[in-house]
Amino acid sequence: GTTCYCGKTIGIYWFGKYSCPTNRGYTGSCPYFLGICCYPVD
């Protein structure tokens, strides 16, 4: 995946999604260009 930032927190960018995949252990997210940024990086 592509990296992205929620403030200073690095995450993975999911294009076209508006919620994070539930099976990857993400603890947070923020809206990102045409999608969502989910962290922490797995």
UniProtKB/Swiss-Prot annotation:
Gene3D superfamilies xref list: Anthopleurin-A (2.20.20.10)
UniProt keyword list: Disulfide bond, Ion channel impairing toxin, Nematocyst, Neurotoxin, Potassium channel impairing toxin, Secreted, Toxin, Voltage-gated potassium channel impairing toxin, Voltage-gated sodium channel impairing toxin
Protein name as it appears in the record: Kappa-actitoxin-Ael2e
Cystine bridges: 4-37, 6-30, 20-38
Keyword Disulfide bond: yes
Principal location class: secreted
Entry comment, domain topic: Has the CSbeta/beta fold, which comprises anti-parallel beta-sheets stabilized by three or four disulfide bonds.
GO cellular component: extracellular region; nematocyst
A Pfam family it matches: Defensin_4
Family: Belongs to the sea anemone type 3 (BDS) potassium channel toxin family.
InterPro entries recorded: BDS_K_chnl_tox, Myo_ane_neurotoxin_sf
Cellular localization per UniProt: Secreted; Nematocyst
Cited function: Inhibits voltage-gated potassium and sodium channels. It potently inhibits human Kv10.1/KCNH1/EAG1 (IC(50)=1.1 uM) and Kv1.4/KCNA4, and moderately inhibits rat Kv1.3/KCNA3, human Kv1.5/KCNA5 and human Kv2.1/KCNB1. Likely to act as a gating-modifier toxin that binds to closed Kv10.1 channels and reduces their activation by shifting their voltage-dependence in the positive direction and suppressing their current amplitudes elicited by strong depolarizing pulses. On sodium channels, it blocks rat Nav1.4/SCN4A, human Nav1.5/SCN5A and displays relatively weak inhibition of mouse Nav1.6/SCN8A.
Species this protein is from: Anthopleura elegantissima
Keyword GTP-binding attached: no
Note: Negative results: does not block human Kv11.1/KCNH2/ERG1, Xenopus laevis Kv11.1/KCNH2/ERG1 and human Kv1.1/KCNA1.
GO molecular function, one term: toxin activity
